[in-house]
Amino acid sequence: MSLKAELDAFRSEFMAQVPPEIREAMVRADMELAASGIARRALKAGDRAPDFNLPDARGGHVRLKDLLATGPVVLSFYRGGWCPYCNLELHALQQALPEITRLGAKLVAVSPQTPDESLSTTEKNALSFSVLSDIGSTTAKAFGIAYESCRRIAADLRALRPCFTGEER
Protein backbone atom coordinates (compact mmCIF):
# COMPACT_ATOMS: atom_id res chain seq x y z
CA MET A 1 0.00 0.00 0.00
CA SER A 2 1.34 3.47 -0.85
CA LEU A 3 2.01 6.03 1.87
CA LYS A 4 -0.83 8.19 0.55
CA ALA A 5 -3.24 5.26 0.77
CA GLU A 6 -2.07 4.49 4.33
CA LEU A 7 -2.48 8.14 5.37
CA ASP A 8 -5.93 8.37 3.77
CA ALA A 9 -7.07 5.14 5.45
CA PHE A 10 -5.76 6.25 8.84
CA ARG A 11 -7.42 9.65 8.56
CA SER A 12 -10.79 8.14 7.60
CA GLU A 13 -10.69 5.67 10.49
CA PHE A 14 -9.43 8.26 12.98
CA MET A 15 -11.96 10.93 12.02
CA ALA A 16 -14.79 8.42 12.34
CA GLN A 17 -13.79 7.73 15.96
CA VAL A 18 -13.12 11.19 17.40
CA PRO A 19 -15.72 13.56 18.85
CA PRO A 20 -17.07 16.27 16.52
CA GLU A 21 -15.23 19.09 18.32
CA ILE A 22 -11.88 17.39 17.70
CA ARG A 23 -12.76 16.77 14.05
CA GLU A 24 -13.73 20.43 13.68
CA ALA A 25 -10.50 21.62 15.32
CA MET A 26 -8.42 19.41 13.05
CA VAL A 27 -10.25 20.50 9.91
CA ARG A 28 -9.90 24.14 10.99
CA ALA A 29 -6.16 23.66 11.60
CA ASP A 30 -5.77 22.07 8.15
CA MET A 31 -7.61 24.98 6.51
CA GLU A 32 -5.56 27.56 8.43
CA LEU A 33 -2.34 25.86 7.40
CA ALA A 34 -3.41 25.76 3.74
CA ALA A 35 -4.44 29.44 3.87
CA SER A 36 -1.24 30.53 5.65
CA GLY A 37 0.80 30.65 2.46
CA ILE A 38 3.44 28.36 3.92
CA ALA A 39 3.70 26.41 0.65
CA ARG A 40 4.60 29.62 -1.20
CA ARG A 41 7.26 30.55 1.39
CA ALA A 42 8.88 27.12 1.70
CA LEU A 43 12.08 26.32 -0.15
CA LYS A 44 11.49 24.84 -3.58
CA ALA A 45 13.31 22.21 -5.62
CA GLY A 46 16.61 23.72 -6.73
CA ASP A 47 16.79 26.24 -3.86
CA ARG A 48 19.95 26.16 -1.77
CA ALA A 49 19.29 24.44 1.56
CA PRO A 50 20.50 26.39 4.59
CA ASP A 51 23.20 24.63 6.59
CA PHE A 52 22.38 23.39 10.07
CA ASN A 53 24.10 21.66 12.97
CA LEU A 54 21.56 19.73 15.06
CA PRO A 55 21.76 17.19 17.88
CA ASP A 56 20.85 13.64 17.02
CA ALA A 57 18.97 11.13 19.15
CA ARG A 58 22.17 9.52 20.45
CA GLY A 59 23.99 12.62 21.73
CA GLY A 60 26.00 13.54 18.64
CA HIS A 61 25.60 16.47 16.27
CA VAL A 62 24.94 16.37 12.53
CA ARG A 63 25.78 19.17 10.12
CA LEU A 64 24.09 19.27 6.72
CA LYS A 65 27.26 20.54 5.05
CA ASP A 66 29.13 17.42 6.23
CA LEU A 67 26.39 15.10 4.96
CA LEU A 68 26.33 16.83 1.57
CA ALA A 69 30.10 16.42 1.26
CA THR A 70 29.52 12.67 0.85
CA GLY A 71 26.55 12.85 -1.53
CA PRO A 72 22.86 13.77 -1.77
CA VAL A 73 20.64 13.98 1.31
CA VAL A 74 16.96 13.14 1.66
CA LEU A 75 15.69 15.42 4.41
CA SER A 76 12.31 14.82 6.05
CA PHE A 77 10.74 17.20 8.55
CA TYR A 78 8.07 15.76 10.85
CA ARG A 79 6.08 17.06 13.83
CA GLY A 80 7.04 14.44 16.40
CA GLY A 81 6.58 10.90 17.60
CA TRP A 82 3.18 11.86 19.04
CA CYS A 83 1.86 12.35 15.47
CA PRO A 84 0.45 9.15 13.94
CA TYR A 85 0.69 10.58 10.42
CA CYS A 86 4.38 11.30 10.99
CA ASN A 87 4.97 7.77 12.28
CA LEU A 88 3.43 6.37 9.09
CA GLU A 89 5.78 8.59 7.07
CA LEU A 90 8.81 7.52 9.12
CA HIS A 91 7.87 3.88 8.57
CA ALA A 92 7.61 4.47 4.81
CA LEU A 93 10.99 6.21 4.83
CA GLN A 94 12.54 3.29 6.71
CA GLN A 95 11.15 0.95 4.04
CA ALA A 96 12.61 3.19 1.31
CA LEU A 97 16.01 3.48 3.02
CA PRO A 98 17.68 0.60 1.11
CA GLU A 99 16.77 2.23 -2.22
CA ILE A 100 17.84 5.68 -0.99
CA THR A 101 21.18 4.21 0.13
CA ARG A 102 21.58 2.27 -3.14
CA LEU A 103 21.22 5.57 -5.00
CA GLY A 104 24.06 7.03 -2.93
CA ALA A 105 22.01 9.32 -0.69
CA LYS A 106 21.66 9.67 3.06
CA LEU A 107 18.30 9.92 4.86
CA VAL A 108 17.81 12.28 7.80
CA ALA A 109 14.63 13.20 9.69
CA VAL A 110 14.20 16.43 11.66
CA SER A 111 11.59 17.33 14.28
CA PRO A 112 11.14 19.92 17.04
CA GLN A 113 11.27 17.13 19.65
CA THR A 114 13.90 16.97 22.36
CA PRO A 115 16.75 14.49 21.76
CA ASP A 116 15.21 12.13 24.37
CA GLU A 117 11.89 12.12 22.49
CA SER A 118 13.73 11.67 19.19
CA LEU A 119 15.46 8.63 20.69
CA SER A 120 12.09 7.24 21.77
CA THR A 121 10.73 7.79 18.25
CA THR A 122 13.81 6.13 16.75
CA GLU A 123 13.45 3.08 18.98
CA LYS A 124 9.65 2.82 18.72
CA ASN A 125 9.78 2.90 14.93
CA ALA A 126 13.01 0.83 14.62
CA LEU A 127 14.61 3.56 12.51
CA SER A 128 18.12 3.07 11.18
CA PHE A 129 18.61 6.63 9.93
CA SER A 130 19.48 9.79 11.87
CA VAL A 131 16.70 11.61 13.70
CA LEU A 132 17.67 15.18 14.59
CA SER A 133 16.21 17.61 17.13
CA ASP A 134 15.34 21.12 15.94
CA ILE A 135 14.21 22.57 19.28
CA GLY A 136 12.68 25.98 18.65
CA SER A 137 12.21 25.02 14.97
CA THR A 138 15.10 27.24 13.88
CA THR A 139 15.96 24.96 10.98
CA ALA A 140 12.32 24.46 9.97
CA LYS A 141 11.94 28.26 9.96
CA ALA A 142 15.04 28.61 7.74
CA PHE A 143 13.43 26.15 5.31
CA GLY A 144 10.16 28.14 5.48
CA ILE A 145 8.04 25.29 6.87
CA ALA A 146 7.56 26.02 10.60
CA TYR A 147 4.04 26.36 11.98
CA GLU A 148 2.24 26.11 15.33
CA SER A 149 -0.34 23.36 14.77
CA CYS A 150 -0.13 21.52 18.10
CA ARG A 151 -0.58 24.61 20.26
CA ARG A 152 -3.46 25.83 18.11
CA ILE A 153 -5.30 22.51 18.32
CA ALA A 154 -4.67 22.29 22.06
CA ALA A 155 -6.06 25.80 22.53
CA ASP A 156 -9.12 24.94 20.45
CA LEU A 157 -9.76 21.87 22.55
CA ARG A 158 -8.99 23.67 25.83
CA ALA A 159 -6.75 20.77 26.75
CA LEU A 160 -3.03 20.66 27.23
CA ARG A 161 -1.62 18.19 24.75
CA PRO A 162 2.18 18.25 25.08
CA CYS A 163 4.10 18.12 21.83
CA PHE A 164 7.41 17.05 23.42
CA THR A 165 9.16 19.98 21.79
CA GLY A 166 10.85 21.13 24.94
CA GLU A 167 9.01 24.45 24.69
CA GLU A 168 6.11 23.56 26.99
CA ARG A 169 8.36 23.14 30.01
Q: Where on the chain are the PLM-derived regions?
A:
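Thiol/selenol-based redox catalytic cores and closely related redox-interacting motifs
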Residues: 134-169
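Short active-site neighborhood of thiol/selenol oxidoreductases, capturing the structured segment around
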Residues: 64-93
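Structural microenvironment flanking redox-active thiols in thiol-disulfide oxidoreductases
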Residues: 89-140
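N-terminal targeting signals for export/organelle localization
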Residues: 1-48
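Long amphipathic N-terminal alpha/beta scaffold segment
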Residues: 31-72
